[in-house]
Amino acid sequence: MASSIWKGLVGIGLFALAHAAFSAAQHRSYMRLTEKEDETLPIDIVLQTLLAFIVACYGIVHIAGEFKDMDATSELRNKTFDTLRNHPSFYVFNHRGRVMFQPPESEDCHRIQAPFSSNSSLKLSKLESMHR
């Protein structure tokens, strides 16, 4: 219930800001027509703009909820050292280490092996006999 009151207050503030902007634009066009371009805005438009801005900001602050502490220790108390700098979205598994750290036997097989090569089948049979 309270949230809808603050949302209504923000809506009223934004509507009042839009009305003040429209009034300022209308006043400016009137000043152009009367050739009095050096005059400032009337005080009622200025006050409406300031009051609407304050009302909208006040409603937004109450909708946003509780503020967090500026000191990060209150948020870091419930985290362990392992999860502190752990960012799983930055893990990369497709890198050159897969090729660099292969056993030498399997590395040769992958380099030399061709689809219809009799030489590659000979090497494979030699490797299989070595592993038995």
From Swiss-Prot:
Outline which residue ranges sit on the Cytoplasmic face. 1-3, 64-132
Give GO BP annotations, semicolon-separated.
Answer: magnesium ion transport; protein insertion into ER membrane by stop-transfer membrane-anchor sequence; tail-anchored membrane protein insertion into ER membrane
Query: Mainly resides where?
Result: endoplasmic reticulum
- Topology within the bilayer: Multi-pass membrane protein
Those parts of the protein on the Lumenal side are: 23-43
**Which Gene Ontology molecular-function terms are recorded?**
magnesium ion transmembrane transporter activity
Q: Kindly state the subunit structure of this protein.
A: Component of the ER membrane protein complex (EMC).
What protein is this chain from?
ER membrane protein complex subunit 5
Q: Which organism is it from?
A: Xenopus tropicalis (Western clawed frog)
